[in-house]
């Protein structure tokens, strides 16, 4: 068969509360999000590796409140008015390139107007070493929750959920095989799923063990 991609049904990424698999590695973050609006602190940072479920948790929060959700790279002065009309602001994938003055101003709005602020990032924001002292003070007074590396049960659930989202049927014994051999990294798990999906479509092959072994070697 040629290397041309064949027709596939559109995949659907489920970001509902009932689709989130809870394990000891993410229990604290999950419980905190679901405690809204009775948060012990109104500003929180949830951090963890790529694919750890931060965006899923953000979407769960978004379903509970009047919310503005935005990627860090899209932050601008225009967000001030928009935030004023919302109850909660979610800033995703915060990094050191963010404007410290802009972030500090948004933080102040959250505190002064009794709003909620959720920031997601790969690393805890108290490790960013901001130059603006007032911003550092805000960070220090906020709640910071980490999501740990996945357990075997969580890896299995992530694989099963993503295969289901993509309308793919994979035998449980093959999922067990993957769990025992894949790198214990959310990023690698995500990369494996995307690569397996891509190459099965290119080759027109079912999700046989042979293909799974090939993809595990590739990543």
Cite the ranges covered by each PLM segment.
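A short, basic N-terminal segment
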Residues: 1-35, 40, 201-219
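Walker A/P-loop nucleotide-binding motif
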Residues: 41-57
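Post-Walker A helix-loop "phosphate-sensing" segment adjacent to the P-loop in P-loop NTPases
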Residues: 62-73
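Conserved P-loop NTPase "ATPase switch" module shared by AAA+ and STAND
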Residues: 82-106, 113-122
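Short regulatory helix/loop adjacent to the ATP-binding pocket of P-loop NTPases
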Residues: 125-140
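Conserved AAA+ ATPase "SRH/arginine-finger" region at the nucleotide-binding site
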Residues: 142-154
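Short conserved motifs of the RecA-like P-loop NTPase core
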Residues: 169-182
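The conserved phosphate-sensing helix
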Residues: 182-196
